[in-house]
């Protein structure tokens, strides 16, 4: 793969290797040279061996090949004539301490003198051979030349800004934008009964509720509700499609503000297959014993000790990979959840066990940043419902696929109040489900960081077709441009096809001079197959021992430890501090070393979460992923 002129300048001191066959007499240009970024892989595969006398790119540009050479031939002195001489950059001297001294008056720098005569602009340059130019004003205006303004009075020194001086706006008082109150109600038991109600810390679910839930869509052929207590965690389950909080708004409150009532101790879990028993999932599924297929305690997973209100939805055969099929399963489940929400609305405030106050502040004068979350947008379960009426509800929400996958801005509190109902896809280990957004670690970390002014959270869909990917990505770039931010986080779930637009998002934001920190599951199996020069600051969400998608729910998703690393990296990038180039191959020690550095600088301990090795061995791990153990 050849390089561009811009890339050749950046890699002037890297070694020069032909990317393709070149004939004798060829004048070497960027189009003849291989990308140095892939040399390591080529060497590992035995396709490339670089000798000690290999020339650098800056030395070979413009030189003539004296004999024909094949692709992947390192360019050495005997192959070329007219080799350039390049000098190494002089080492930067350490900046000395500033010395106070009287400030001398600075005379204005000599500038070309412009005179306007009639419709002509005459320029006299008192250098060299006294060049005089006469240019029509209509053309001069296009060149950006304007008529001279009045000169400053003689003897008055005009202020001159230092080349390195930065104008920093004074930090103002934090501005409270909106608040959200969450009232928590404790649930200790879930049982079936004649009606849906909440009484004495117990949820009672109407015994015949499934008879009505199945009528929500003609694609739903059956639905069952199973109450899973901690004693039942070893039971078999079909693939987990979503994990959802049970919450409802008080009064006419909207998502992201007002008061939300939340149930503690129980969650909704959506599972299902089609009539032929095919799991409603793509590239991996988490069917099996629950205790062996869930990474408990992750932002998007159940917590140990919670009661799981698990629906098992059956949809018509062959509809599991069509948009209406998975959506029907979610709608049928939400019918049941809504009855519980209505019961939750009726509880007296005396039963509140905890009141959580969330506040969104803007911080004038602090580093303004934006969080960009790439979500799936190919259809089927590759979809998300944005801003329902109820937290993680269905009614009132708009699918991002129907919105064209274009960027949609949410406030941090809208995200944390159930503003995203995820129809999750990709492998279970790296999918971000509805509960993940309800407890989104990066949003929480950045929103509460007093050194940042969080402008908002942008959700952008990942379409299937490349042309649509780049269209959406360009809209994202334009949106971020209007925000005038100083830094950006870009996250994605899963891996593979979505990395194409993930890379494009980095380019669209980075080309506007904005430092970007990217977050994705990569490691071994999800390694990036595309990239660009703006993808310098990356955080890998991998937790798995082998660096793979092992189909354990939420194993490789963004967690608090990743958010802390990303925040530290963006602060370093904004400050233009050195960030070492990533290693070519996955090395888990990189993460551990970075965590140690952050702990040392911040003076606080970062808790690293366990991975699948603490779980009972699942069937898939035993037969596929860890068969050699």
Curated annotation (Swiss-Prot):
Q: Which superkingdom, per the lineage?
A: Bacteria
Q: Which reaction does it catalyse?
A: [PrdC protein]-Se-L-selenocysteinyl-S-L-cysteine + 5-aminopentanoate = [PrdC protein]-L-selenocysteine/L-cysteine + D-proline
User: Where are residues bearing Pyruvic acid (Cys) located in the sequence?
Assistant: 425
Active site at which residues?
425 (covalent intermediate with substrate)
User: Which keywords fit this entry according to its UniProt record?
Assistant: Cytoplasm, Oxidoreductase, Pyruvate
Q: Reply yes or no: does the keyword Oxidoreductase apply.
A: yes
Enumerate the InterPro entries for this protein: D_pro_red_PrdA, Gly_reductase_pB_sua/b
Q: What class of enzyme is it?
A: oxidoreductase
State where the protein is found: Cytoplasm
What GO molecular-function term can you cite, just one? D-proline reductase activity
Primary subcellular site in the record, as a coarse category? cytoplasm
Q: Which GO terms describe its cellular component?
A: cytoplasm
PTM section of the record:
The peptide chain is cleaved into beta and alpha chains, and the alpha chain N-terminal cysteine is deaminated and oxidized to form a reactive pyruvoyl group.
Write down the EC number.
Answer: 1.21.4.1
Other noteworthy facts: The reaction mechanism first involves the formation of an adduct (and not a Schiff base) between the nitrogen of proline and the pyruvoyl group of the alpha subunit. The selenol anion of selenocysteine in PrdB nucleophilically attacks the alpha-carbon, resulting in cleavage of the N-C bond of the proline ring. This intermediate is then transformed to the oxidized gamma subunit containing a mixed selenide/sulfide group and to the 5-aminovalerate adduct of the alpha subunit. The final product, 5-aminovalerate, is formed by hydrolysis.
NCBIfam families reported for this sequence: D_pro_red_PrdA (TIGR04480)
Under the subunit heading, UniProt states: Consists of 3 subunits of 23, 26 and 45 kDa (alpha, gamma and beta respectively). The molecular weight of the complex is approximately 870 kDa, suggesting a decameric structure, if all 3 subunits are present in equal stoichiometry.
Tell me, what does this protein do in biology?
D-proline reductase catalyzes the reductive cleavage of a C-N bond in D-proline resulting in the formation of 5-aminovalerate. The alpha subunit has been shown to bind D-proline, presumably via the pyruvoyl group.
Q: What is this protein called?
A: D-proline reductase proprotein PrdA
